[in-house]
């Protein structure tokens, strides 16, 4: 006979079992972050702010991370820092970010100070440093910079490449009158001839094309050892608490990297990045004679690891840090490997050895 009216004890037991079954789902939902905070180590342009030059920029402009979490009710917040890498490090130290896009040297500086993060993937690699001077300047080469007023944004990944380029020419920062300026201030100072030279990035092409500067040096022409790398990192605490979220963020950025690396999209890519305020022509110049797959590869290959080890060693040699930084174990490739497999991209990007030569 069917018991149509269960006893109070049986009803209580049924409710208790139901609540225990439901509890893990409720707990898991409550454990999701309300917002994913991604720091960007540069000043954004526009409203809302955007940036360019990397697969992370593509992901932000195409809202790939936002689309990934649209059905979860999780917001994605991109936070831009005029103070670049050093300012991002401060935000990381204050637990104000979950992820960050920044350059190699700032991350090494943070690690030397005990900030615990994991490097998830490369966002842009083999990026050159440019040195520009006023158009009527008599400066023709790095050797001519001795005793000149030169702006360098210290603590960013521009600094170390510039220091190595100076060393190759028998100079150091002490041989120059170095002025520490952020990117915007440096561009303004160069345009007004308030300085004799500026160490910068692709933004210097805009001044050149406007007739306000000439570029006397591009570090990528000296080989991959004179380039800078950027990455996406995650804070240790966030990764331990939300590995599933980390995986999905990496999935989204790998999608952006694949689209950005497709030569069929070169024109569309530079037009997309031009929304950041950097002209299309500047991106053309910055990526001239380089394959998109080489510049926008997310791979954690021997070349990338070697460059971070070199940055750590050079930073110690130049006394930018006080103690050695261990790079081994800093990278966490499992999320990238999962994304590459899921998107059938295991062999899409070429891998390079520590010296920058293709692996067979």
Where are the regions a protein language model picked out?
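Short, well-ordered beta-strand elements
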Residues: 32-56, 74-80, 147-151, 177-179
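Secondary-structure end/capping motifs
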Residues: 44-46, 50, 241-324
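Short, polar/charged alpha-helical segment
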Residues: 45-76, 112-113, 307
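Short helix-initiation/N-cap motifs at beta->coil->alpha
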Residues: 78-90, 103, 171, 176-191
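A ligand-binding cleft/hinge motif common to bilobed small-molecule-binding domains
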Residues: 101-113, 163-164, 168, 195-215, ...
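Flexible hinge/capping segments at coil-to-helix
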Residues: 134-149, 240-244
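Pocket-lining segment of extracytoplasmic ligand-binding domains
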Residues: 179, 185-277
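Conserved C-terminal helix/tail region of periplasmic/extracytoplasmic solute-binding proteins
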Residues: 313-360
């Amino acid at each position: 006979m069917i018991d149509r009216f269960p006893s109070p004890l049986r009803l209580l037991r049924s409710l208790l079992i139901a609540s225990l079954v439901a509890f893990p789902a409720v707990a898991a939902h409550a454990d999701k972050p309300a917002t994913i905070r991604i720091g960007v180590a540069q000043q954004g342009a526009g409203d809302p702010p955007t940036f360019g030059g990397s697969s992370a920029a593509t992901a932000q402009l195409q809202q790939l991370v936002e689309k990934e979490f649209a059905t979860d009710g999780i917001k994605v917040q991109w936070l831009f820092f005029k103070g670049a890498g050093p300012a991002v490090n401060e935000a990381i130290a204050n637990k104000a970010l979950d992820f960050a896009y920044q350059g190699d040297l700032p991350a090494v500086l943070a690690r030397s100070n005990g900030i615990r993060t994991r490097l998830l993937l490369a966002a842009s690699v083999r990026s050159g440093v440019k040195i520009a001077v006023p158009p009527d300047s008599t400066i023709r080469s790095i050797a001519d910079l001795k005793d000149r007023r030169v702006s360098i944004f210290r603590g960013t990944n521009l600094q170390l490449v510039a220091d190595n380029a100076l060393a190759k020419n028998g100079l150091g920062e002490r041989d120059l009158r170095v002025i520490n300026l952020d990117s915007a201030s440096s561009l303004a100072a160069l345009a007004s001839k308030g300085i004799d030279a500026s160490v910068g990035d692709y933004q210097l092409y805009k001044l050149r094309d406007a007739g306000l500067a000439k570029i006397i040096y591009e570090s990528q022409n000296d080989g991959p050892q004179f380039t800078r790398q950027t990455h996406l990192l995650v804070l240790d605490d966030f990764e331990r608490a939300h590995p599933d979220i980390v995986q999905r963020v990496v999935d989204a950025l790998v999608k952006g990297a694949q689209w950005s690396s497709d030569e069929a999209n070169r024109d569309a890519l530079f037009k997309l990045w031009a929304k950041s305020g950097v002209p299309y022509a500047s991106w053309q110049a910055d990526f001239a004679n380089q394959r998109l797959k080489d510049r926008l590869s997310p791979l954690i290959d021997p070349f990338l690891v070697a460059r971070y080890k070199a940055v750590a060693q050079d930073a110690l040699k130049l006394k930018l840090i006080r103690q050695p930084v261990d790079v081994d174990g800093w990278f966490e490739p499992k999320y990238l490997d999962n994304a590459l497999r899921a998107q059938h991209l295991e062999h899409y990007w070429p891998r390079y050895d520590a010296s920058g030569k293709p692996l067979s």
